[in-house]
Design a protein with these regions (language model features):
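Acidic, metal/ion-coordinating pockets
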Residues: 21-358
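Bacterial Sec-dependent N-terminal signal peptides
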Residues: 1-21
């Protein structure tokens, strides 16, 4: 809660600064040879399928929330709406409000909203989701980006700029499209993957932040390698000033690379879901540090890639549970169904081999 309160205060200060004609600050003494550092973690698709609705969501990240709490700022791709009852899973997701609150309680500070399911319940569903997130922002400091209720909110949230630890960090979140509805409608705003829209966000981010995190929702589902469209966009985003690019949507981990020195994680995969298709239960948590040293030079340290595994009910315990793979290697005796441990290790080896991730 203290982390979120601080982030919220700093976000509000940054909003005031962006809207002010000048930003006067009294300089404070600072020791020589020090660096400003902001640690960030991003996780992939947080989903709520129909079967998940039957279980207590407050256990989903019980075994991995320590990873979410470690960072100064943690962001997650929230791939569902909060459209109210009746709650539904695929193909049109509507989760309980408590699910979003649980993710906040686990340590998630920023909700990434631009994805293909955000209009699953129409304009009304998106509007209600934004109302819930706005209330959470007011009450507990949760922030969001990728969508907005109106032009004023759009200016504040897209890009989302956070000032913390002496660092200004911008999140630029956008999606290739939506499964239903029309994301091009003027309000509520869904940030689309077109060059004009994204270029405007990137320009504002460059001008007002030290580091720019580009978060595209893109790519082909279930493919372990990125496609030509993703690569073209990644190259363009580096030209537009991205400091790091972290993608979502394919529901599996994809390969990583560097383009002109900029780290690119093409897809993180599913953080939690009921999906059991090949490779869909393995995910990456992406951890990095944004650093400005005493000379004013800026750099991204990392990313460090942490593999997570989503166990479904009856495998490790009687609920869904996302676990850090490395912490559970060699502990097959913990599983109710040992074959799931074998599935985890085999999937890990296969994905590492096919993506080239060490």
């Amino acid at each position: 809660m203290q982390k979120k309160a601080l982030i919220s205060i700093l976000f509000l200060i940054s909003c005031l600064s962006l809207n002010a004609q000048w930003d006067y600050r009294i300089p404070s003494p600072k020791p020589l040879w020090t660096s400003d550092t902001l640690s960030v973690t991003v996780i992939g698709d947080v989903m709520m399928h129909s079967r998940q609705l039957e279980y207590d969501c407050r256990r989903f990240f019980a075994r991995s929330e320590h990873l979410l709490r470690q960072a100064d700022v943690t962001a997650a791709n929230m791939e569902f709406t909060l459209a109210g009852e009746p709650y539904t899973g695929y193909p049109c997701f509507s989760a309980p409000d408590a699910y979003a609150q649980y993710m906040a309680d686990c340590g998630v500070d920023v909700f990434l909203m631009a994805n293909n399911h955000i209009l699953d319940k129409g304009i009304q569903g998106l509007e209600r989701t934004l109302q819930v997130y706005d209330r959470m922002q007011d009450e507990s400091g949760i922030l969001y980006t990728g969508c907005a209720a109106d032009a004023e909110s759009d200016a504040l949230h897209n890009p989302l700029i956070i000032k913390m630890n002496g660092i200004r960090l911008a999140f630029v979140n956008f999606t290739y499209g939506t499964n239903t509805g029309d994301p091009s409608l003027p309000v509520p705003v869904v940030k689309r993957m077109d060059r004009e829209t994204v270029a405007a966000m990137m320009k504002k981010a460059r001008e007002n932040a030290d580091f720019v995190v580009a978060l595209p929702h893109w790519g082909e589902e279930y493919q372990l390698r990125h496609n030509a469209v993703q690569e073209d966009w990644a190259r363009w985003l580096t030209e537009q000033g991205a400091s790091i690019i972290i993608g979502a949507h394919p529901h599996v981990v994809q390969d990583t690379t560097h383009i002109s020195g900029v780290p690119v994680v093409y897809s993180m995969g599913n953080a939690v879901s009921n999906m059991t298709a090949r490779n869909t239960r393995l995910e990456l948590a992406v951890k990095f540090k944004a650093v400005r040293d005493w000379r004013g030079e800026k750099k991204i340290i990392g990313p460090d890639l942490v593999f997570l595994w989503c166990t479904v009910p009856g495998m490790l315990e009687d609920n869904y549970s996302t676990i850090p793979v490395e912490e559970y290697l060699g502990k097959s005796e913990l599983w109710k169904t040992p074959s799931d441990y074998d599935n985890m290790t085999e999937t890990l080896d296969r994905v590492k081999k096919e993506t080239g991730i060490e």
